[in-house]
Amino acid sequence: MSNSSPETVSQPSQEVKYGEREIAEGQLITFPNPRVGRRYDINITLPEFTCKCPFSGYPDFATIYITYVPDERVVELKALKLYINSYRDRYISHEESANQILDDFVAACDPLEATVKADFTPRGNVHTVVEVKHRK
């Protein structure tokens, strides 16, 4: 038997964590395309997308695939990651999330072409894949 007193468990701090602050402040940031005039594809995979079902409140998980042909601007990847993380506590349907991501992406970098594919993890024996496209 030990004479030491039991450890106290500290309560979580109510202050906003730096990661939460970065996500809340996050915006899609772009920089100049280093090869304007050359047509090339950029493929991005974001395997940890989460949001909440607007009907049940249950979490939904997806892999987001973004493919785009840049024009004059390219999206900065850390900013994109933080933007995607901002959906974590948002109540939004599969269809609306894919469309909103595409709308915001196009507004930020005005690509020649862009496709957002949201491949949701099956829930209740239903597998949903939403693919939306933009072309100038």
UniProtKB/Swiss-Prot annotation:
The active site is at residues 53, 60. Its EC number is 1.7.1.13. Substrate binds at residues 75-77, 94-95. It catalyses: 7-aminomethyl-7-carbaguanine + 2 NADP(+) = 7-cyano-7-deazaguanine + 2 NADPH + 3 H(+). It holds the Pfam family QueF. GO terms for molecular function: preQ1 synthase activity. GO terms for cellular component: cytoplasm. It is found in: Cytoplasm. InterPro entries: GTP-CH-I_C/QueF, NADPH_dep_7-cyano-7-deazaG_red, QueF, QueF_type1. The keyword Oxidoreductase applies. Keywords: Cytoplasm, NADP, Oxidoreductase, Queuosine biosynthesis. GO terms for biological process: queuosine biosynthetic process; tRNA modification. Pathway: tRNA modification; tRNA-queuosine biosynthesis. Its main location: cytoplasm. Belongs to the GTP cyclohydrolase I family. QueF type 1 subfamily. Catalyzes the NADPH-dependent reduction of 7-cyano-7-deazaguanine (preQ0) to 7-aminomethyl-7-deazaguanine (preQ1). This is NADPH-dependent 7-cyano-7-deazaguanine reductase. It comes from Trichormus variabilis (strain ATCC 29413 / PCC 7937) (Anabaena variabilis).
